[in-house]
Design a protein with these regions (language model features):
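Bacterial N-terminal signal peptides that target proteins for export
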Residues: 1-13
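Bacterial N-terminal signal peptides
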Residues: 10-22
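PEST-like low-complexity, intrinsically disordered acidic/proline/serine-rich tracts
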Residues: 21-277
Length: 277
């Protein structure tokens, strides 16, 4: 079974757990201020991207992963949480797949969903946050971009105040991130990740040698593109890049979803690795 196939198999198992989280029907119904609308009152997602008072593109808003799999019971468990192909395998669509080091290939073959830090209630770190089916609220100021995730009340900080990226930051799940503007694109550099991270449900790795670059651009009101580049010689034979798309979500708010409250699903996940191989 290929890494992509394993990713999709594990995706189905993870989705079963995710469906225990608050569903869309339970999300709040609050109108979002400042949303451009068509004459019939619907959000105009193709309207120009907003700008901040200090002349920068405004990335603020509620976002979630695009490129969602069809709800056919095979590629995706049917439910209200929209699962993307890249959640199962970040290299989906990359010709030839990701350039794994052999130990990563071995891990993908040997490990299962119960080994994924995400299924053990550990908040997904760094770029994996972009692929989650849960909603993320981006809050942008001149000196800081904060990404709030409704899953486990987690957050990520991206410093925009001109500070350099530390040479050897303490390893964390989210790493240490700094950003600067190049025209209408926010360029984010990050490092300082833990060695035991997964980038997707297949088990693609991110280690302490990783240097991650995210080029974030809001192409219109409704679409955010993130060109993600990973240079991690411990896990990959060469650098690689993918594009992650985010869709804006309006007229709602985040709902608290604490993983430990769904720990009744863990016994099923513990039995899943042998079935997923």
């Amino acid at each position: 079974m290929s890494p992509m196939d394993r990713g999709y198999t594990r995706l189905l198992l993870l989705a079963a757990m995710l469906l225990a989280l608050p569903l869309a029907a339970q999300w709040f119904d609050y109108p979002t201020r400042g949303v451009p609308r068509t004459p019939d009152g619907k959000p105009n997602l193709n309207a120009p991207a907003p700008w901040t008072a200090d002349g920068k593109p405004d990335l603020s808003g509620m976002w979630r992963a695009a490129n969602r799999l069809p709800c056919d019971g095979v590629n995706r468990v049917c439910g209200d949480l929209p699962i993307s192909a890249q959640f199962g395998n970040i290299g989906a669509g990359v010709e030839g797949g990701l350039p794994y080091q052999q130990w990563v290939r071995d891990r993908i073959r040997q490990k299962g969903p119960a080994d994924d830090p995400y299924t053990r209630c550990i908040a997904p770190g760094g770029p994996r946050m972009h692929m989650l089916p849960t909603m993320k609220k981006w809050v942008q100021s001149p000196d800081l971009l904060i990404i709030l995730d409704e899953y486990n009340a987690s957050h990520r900080q991206i410093f925009l105040d001109g500070r350099p990226l530390p040479a050897d930051p303490a390893p964390t799940w989210n790493g240490y991130a700094t950003g600067h503007w190049e025209g209408d694109t926010l360029v984010v550099e990050s490092s300082g990740y833990r060695d035991d991270q997964w980038l997707d449900a297949a088990g693609s790795a991110l280690t302490s040698t990783a240097r991650v670059t995210e080029r974030m651009r809001r192409v219109n009101f409704g679409t955010l593109l993130i060109d993600l580049s990973v240079d991690d010689p411990k896990a990959y034979t060469r650098p690689w890049s993918v594009t992650l798309r985010q869709d804006v979500v309006v007229d709602t708010e985040m709902v608290e979803a604490i993983c430990a409250e769904n720990e009744k699903d863990v016994p099923h996940l513990n039995a899943a690795p042998r079935q997923a191989r």
